[in-house]
Amino acid sequence: VRAVQENFSLTATGFMMSGYFVGYFIGAATIPNLISRVGHIRVFAAFASLASLVILIHSIFINPFVWFILRVLTGVSMVCIYTVAESWLNDRSNNKNRGSVLSIYMVILYSTMGIGMFLLNFSSPENYQPFILVSIITSLALIPILLTKKKPPTFKKIKAMSLRELYEASPFGMVSSLFYGTIQSALFTLLAVYAASMNFSIFEISFVTFLLAISGAVSQFPIGKLSDIYDRRLVIVIVTFGAAIFSICCIFSVGLMYLPEGHATTKNWFFLFLTLFSFCSLPMFSLILACLLYTSDAADDTPCVD
C-alpha cells in the first residue's frame, strides 16, 4: 500500500515484493545448519529480532531497491521463524493427528494475519507509526519462547534431498507444493497492491486482505480433519477444483466493477468469491505439508528437513 502511495511503478513494486520469497528460498536452504549449531530457540530469537529491526528500516529509506533488500531479509527471518514453529509441532504430532494439528496452527496464523490487516486503519501508511507498531508486535513474539520450560525438538542430522529424490518420494506432494507456492505467493504479495490500484479505500484494502486470511483460517480445521479421515490427495484435488471455480468467479466479478454505475453490482460479489476461493485454497498448505511428512514417517531412511 505504501509503495502505491509513493507512486512506485507496478514493475518496481512487483520486483520489491518478490524479495520476500527470494529471502524465503535462501532461509529455507540455510536454516537446518543454523538449528543444528545453536538450536531452535536461539534461531527463533535471532531472526524475530532481525525481522523487528528490518521493519523499522522501511520507514527510513523509501526506495524500491532498498526495500527489495529489506524484503529479502524479512523473507529469511520469517522462514526461519516458521520453520522453528512447524518443526516443533511436527515433533509433537504423528500421522494420525498431524492434519488437525497443522490446521489449528494455520487457523492461528491466518486469523492473526487477517486481524493485523486492520492496523492499516490506525494510522496512514504514509506515516511511520504502522512500522513501529508492527515492530513492537514482532518483538513481543520473543517472550513466550524465551521463557518456555518445554524442551525444544531434538535436532536430527539430516541428509540433503535433491528435487529428484523429493519427487520420487512424494510426486504428488512436490508438484502440489510448487503450484501452491506460485499461486499463493502472488496472491499474498499483490492482492493489497491490486486493491489499491483499483482505488479501494484503506478500510476496503484491509477488509479484502482480512477476508482472504480469515476465511482460510475458518476452513483449516474442518478440511484438516477430513484429511485425517480420507485420503489427503483426494481432499487436495477437491479443494483445488473448488478454488479454481471461485477464482474464475472472482475474475468475472472484477469485470462487473467496470460497468456503468447503473448496471454494475457492488464490490460485494468480489468479496464473496474471494472469500470462497480462500476457503478452498489456503488449507492446501497444511494438507500438502502433511503429505510430504507422511512420506517421511512411512520410510525411516527418507531424508526430511524439519
Name these PLM-found stretches.
Residues 43-56, 235-248:
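Structural signature of the two symmetry-related core transmembrane helices
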Residues 74-105:
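Cytoplasmic helix-loop-helix junction between adjacent transmembrane helices
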Residues 28-39, 220-231:
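Helix-to-loop junctions at the C-terminal end of transmembrane segments
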Residues 61-62, 231, 253-254:
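Helix-breaking motifs and short loop linkers at transmembrane-helix boundaries and internal kinks
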Residues 21-25, 29, 113-114, 213-217, ...:
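Residue-level signature of mid-helix packing/kink "hotspots" within the transmembrane helices
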Residues 294-301:
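Conserved small/polar residues in nucleotide/adenosyl-binding loops
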Residues 65-73, 268-276:
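Paired small-residue
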